[in-house]
């Protein structure tokens, strides 16, 4: 018989640096999950990734307090800022542009995020990522 699912917990944790401090500790502690077990497993799974990259993770907690987790691709905003070599986006994206990014870089990001996105094809996902770039104050060039 399958285990009964108790809860889903969605977090964004920096790769290779999960620890019991907030937000990980309180979120897992409320559900009775072994926090250190999650931290060790997450850090082991993300050790090959760039250190400090924010990784969305969905933790499935079962009624016997066991868990499984699934890591996603980094947020599009993080990947766009990294591709444009910027620290942050614009506070006023309609009036203040902070940088430019090439369309082929946007397409590479869309292909990387394809597993987590719901677009019909790569072209639609590329347009979605372009919209994210514009909302951050980036200009998309050909």
From Swiss-Prot:
- Spell out the post-translational modification annotation for this entry: One or more lysine residues are methylated.
Domain of life of the source: Bacteria
Per the record, its GO cellular-component terms are:
cytosolic large ribosomal subunit
| Cross-referenced CDD domains | Ribosomal_L11
Q: Does the keyword Ribosomal protein apply?
A: yes
Xref: Pfam families:
Ribosomal_L11, Ribosomal_L11_N
Q: Does the keyword Transport apply?
A: no
Coiled coil ranges = none
One example GO MF annotation: structural constituent of ribosome
One biological process term from GO is: translation
Keywords attached to this Swiss-Prot or TrEMBL record, sorted alphabetically, are:
Methylation, Ribonucleoprotein, Ribosomal protein, RNA-binding, rRNA-binding
Write down the NCBIfam families for this protein, in alphabetical order. Answer: L11_bact (TIGR01632)
Q: What does this protein do?
A: Forms part of the ribosomal stalk which helps the ribosome interact with GTP-bound translation factors.
User: What does the annotation say about its assembly with partners?
Assistant: Part of the ribosomal stalk of the 50S ribosomal subunit. Interacts with L10 and the large rRNA to form the base of the stalk. L10 forms an elongated spine to which L12 dimers bind in a sequential fashion forming a multimeric L10(L12)X complex.
> Which family is it part of?
Belongs to the universal ribosomal protein uL11 family.
Can you say what this protein is called? Large ribosomal subunit protein uL11
* Naturally occurring in which organism (per UniProt): Shewanella denitrificans (strain OS217 / ATCC BAA-1090 / DSM 15013)
């Amino acid at each position: 018989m399958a285990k009964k699912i108790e809860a889903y917990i969605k977090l964004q944790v920096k790769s290779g640096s999960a620890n019991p401090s907030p937000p990980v500790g309180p979120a897992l502690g409320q559900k009775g999950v072994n926090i250190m077990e999650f931290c060790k497993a997450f850090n082991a799974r993300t050790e090959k990734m760039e250190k400090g990259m924010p990784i969305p993770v969905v933790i499935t907690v079962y009624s016997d307090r066991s868990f499984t987790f699934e890591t996603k691709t980094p947020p599009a905003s993080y990947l766009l800022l990294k591709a444009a070599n910027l620290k942050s986006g614009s506070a006023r994206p309609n009036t203040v542009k902070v940088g430019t990014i090439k369309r082929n870089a946007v397409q590479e990001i869309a292909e990387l995020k394809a597993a987590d996105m719901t677009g019909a094809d790569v072209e639609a996902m590329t347009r979605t990522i372009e919209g994210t770039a514009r909302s951050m104050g980036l200009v998309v060039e050909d």
